[in-house]
Amino acid sequence: MAADRHYQKGNPEIEPQKSVVTKSDVATFNSAESVSVPNSRYIKPEAFKIPKALFVIYSGGTEREKDYFSLIDKNTELFPFIRTAFHADPKFVKGGKPSIVRFATEKTKEYQESASKENPDHYFLITDVDHFEQFLPEMQQECNTSNIELIISNSCFEVWLYYAEKSNRPVDFVIPQNKLEISSAFKTWANTQINGGLKPTKAIFNIEQNIANAENNYVEENGFPTLFSTQMFRLAEKMLPFVKDGLEQLRSEIERRRIKHK
């Protein structure tokens, strides 16, 4: 069994952990106030409501990518049917051949040893185009062989966060001539276009809007996304049924507190 598995499928005695929404999770969504949904405002999941899905996410990025999914496992009472396991590339070398694929394939084999046929796990590898464009075809082939879905953002993960707030492609962004400078330039630019900047813990609250915007603006060439396109909507579409109700409860609680403190 993989050491990172947070639950044991098929065991009705295992109850989700207590929900704690921290200040860092929702501060960007509701000023600096932390939010914890009171027990009286939602029905606590019964013990037999164990997680039905494990989303294993591999990534070369370690900050915004991880933060985007952090709300889910920190609030297991609100999201009782899903767990996420995030693994960053332990040997990341900027500009070098990504080692995350080999790590992901080996780790996936460990997870598959304890996977449930009734509730199969989902495996995703999130990557950017910026420094890895030449390796993408090889990465795609290796991921397909290991039943891992490769999720590519061009040029970076922040394109996904951008579409959480914006419905149009970033036409005003001045594209650097050097391809390797596009990601850093876009991150700087996007932070000025969105109120409060790019915030992954805020973006997940807009997941449905995010999916629609990213899909509507998606363009690919030879099976890979073109600039300002991201495949993250494919991952988010699979995750949405497991998180939709919990996010709605959080939105309601945030709105209740906003009205209370007017």
Residue ranges and their predicted role:
Residues 1-53, 66, 70-90, 110-262:
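C-terminal accessory helical subdomains adjacent to catalytic cores in phosphodiester-
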Residues 50-68, 92-104:
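N-terminal carbohydrate-binding/catalytic regions of secreted carbohydrate-active enzymes
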Residues 103-111:
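Short, charged, amphipathic alpha-helix that recurs within catalytic cores of restriction-modification
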